[in-house]
């Protein structure tokens, strides 16, 4: 998503190009864009100039909505990931308030970070060679 955000609005970018730029496998990217397209966060375009594009301005996306589209719940424990806490132990669970507090902090943070902010951290498209900095797919510049 951050890679798409660096382009002009409406610009379609191929997964192959993103794969090469971010040093991620094409198969992995396909697994990521499927749920994003399903909920309308990206739009796919077919054809020789095909690829994916954002459906709104990068400032209008939050990291939270992107993560939830891809991962589902971001709750730290399963019983907080459902609308109704169906855990039979919830009334006796002495750690539930801790997990609920952590869940609240996580959600507040990821909902406060925009795609525009994330994309601003990417190196310029024509910068020096990049390599993956970790399994998250982020990049770092080689010096």
State where each predicted segment sits.
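Short amphipathic alpha-helical interface segments
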Residues: 1-9
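C-terminal regulatory/oligomerization modules of transcriptional regulators
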Residues: 63, 81-143
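Alpha-helical residues within the helix-turn-helix
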Residues: 20, 37-38
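Key DNA-contact positions within bacterial/archaeal DNA-binding proteins
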Residues: 27
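Beta-hairpin "wing" of winged helix-turn-helix
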Residues: 40-55
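A short alpha-helical element within helix-turn-helix/winged-helix DNA-binding domains
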Residues: 12-22
């Amino acid at each position: 998503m951050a890679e798409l955000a660096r382009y002009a609005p409406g610009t379609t970018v191929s997964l192959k190009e993103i794969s090469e730029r971010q040093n991620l496998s094409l198969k992995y990217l396909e697994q990521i864009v499927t749920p994003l397209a399903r909920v309308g966060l990206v739009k796919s375009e077919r054809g020789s100039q095909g690829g994916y594009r954002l459906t709104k301005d990068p400032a209008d996306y939050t990291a939270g909505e992107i993560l939830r589209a891809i991962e589902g719940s971001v709750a730290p424990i399963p019983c907080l990931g459902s609308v109704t806490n169906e855990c039979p132990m919830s009334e006796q669970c002495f750690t539930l308030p801790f997990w609920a507090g952590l869940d609240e902090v996580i959600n507040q943070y990821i909902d406060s970070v925009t795609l525009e902010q994330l994309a601003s951290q990417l190196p310029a498209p024509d910068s020096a060679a990049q390599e993956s900095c970790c399994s998250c797919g982020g990049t770092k510049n080689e010096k």
